[in-house]
């Protein structure tokens, strides 16, 4: 997982509330378990509308999604996180996320930032008025900054530490690989063992 410290990029204003994971990536995309190749499935139904915000040329290459409240509701699927990342989003800002989606995001390296709805509104207005306006998401300072906007956000210390250090569940476990190997070597032969790949 790539470490996240500070990211600056253009924003996509997604003025929709209650966006569920099936809208983020439809179920027929869930046939594989690799983490890549999902960008075309992101908001697939909505992207059929030529006026959808992601179809606009000025939004190409934007890397911060500013979403409406209750983003990521519905079923738990890491594919929704992977689709957002594959498209190029490094952070998603909303006034409220579904807990399971937020947990999946943080464990996969996608920073989800909770801000007051008034700040989300200000970011929408800024990015709609000027599609080239940049938004900085600073995890070290726990702050979002844009032209005329500075907002602090909270994130639990464990999730913050893992993101700052680029540690997912597997890499966190592998930090103790030598201890695990020593434990396995000392176990009696009649007990189950881990087999090297």
Swiss-Prot record:
Keywords: Amino-acid biosynthesis, Branched-chain amino acid biosynthesis, Leucine biosynthesis, Lyase. GO terms for molecular function: 3-isopropylmalate dehydratase activity. It comes from the Bacteria. Pathway: Amino-acid biosynthesis; L-leucine biosynthesis; L-leucine from 3-methyl-2-oxobutanoate: step 2/4. It catalyses: (2R,3S)-3-isopropylmalate = (2S)-2-isopropylmalate. GO terms for cellular component: 3-isopropylmalate dehydratase complex. One of its GO terms (biological process) is L-leucine biosynthetic process. InterPro entries: 3-IsopropMal_deHydase_ssu, Aconitase/3IPM_dehydase_swvl, AconitaseA/IPMdHydase_ssu_swvl, IPMI_Swivel, LeuD. Its EC number is 4.2.1.33. Gene3D superfamilies: Aconitase, domain 4. It is an enzyme of class 4 (lyase). Belongs to the LeuD family. LeuD type 1 subfamily. Catalyzes the isomerization between 2-isopropylmalate and 3-isopropylmalate, via the formation of 2-isopropylmaleate. Heterodimer of LeuC and LeuD. This is 3-isopropylmalate dehydratase small subunit. It comes from Streptomyces griseus subsp. griseus (strain JCM 4626 / CBS 651.72 / NBRC 13350 / KCC S-0626 / ISP 5235).
